[in-house]
Amino acid sequence: HQIDPDSRQLFLLAIQMDNYTGCVACFRAGDLFDYAVENILQEIVGEYGGGIVFHSEGHVFYTVLHVAAKSSIISPKDRALSICERFRISIKNNLKNTCSIYIDQPRWLEELPASYIEITEEQEANHHLYYDTIVNLEDNSLPSIYQRAADDGALPVDPIDDVLDYI
């Protein structure tokens, strides 16, 4: 999957493990947990888009994600948010852990370093505020799949069915 550096289809994600220390302790070696997280993320990236997954240090994993619009109805941004939700649910189901995902959309490939700094600063400053959620840096709101449920007066639900429709 080729990355088009001039498209509005490039996203940077910071996936923060909410209970990293506890999960690492459950594995015989700390590297095994990191490998399991990277494997889940890379599998989903490969299935629904393109990009790379890397673990810099501590409890945060990063993904540079490139998605193509699947149709004229679903924007690359909504598709990326749906992929984030797929990450969140897969980590919860497979590793019995929760994560918070910070998403930013640089305009061009050259903006990726600045986006990395912005997303890292946001994650470090607010990691104690967010738990098991997706934080959209562009509009600092919950994704539209959550917002619809809240607008209807209902409590937000785990939108896995909607996610599969989006992806």
Residue ranges and their predicted role:
Residues 1-167:
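Hydrophobic, helix-rich cores of sensory/ligand-binding and other regulatory modules
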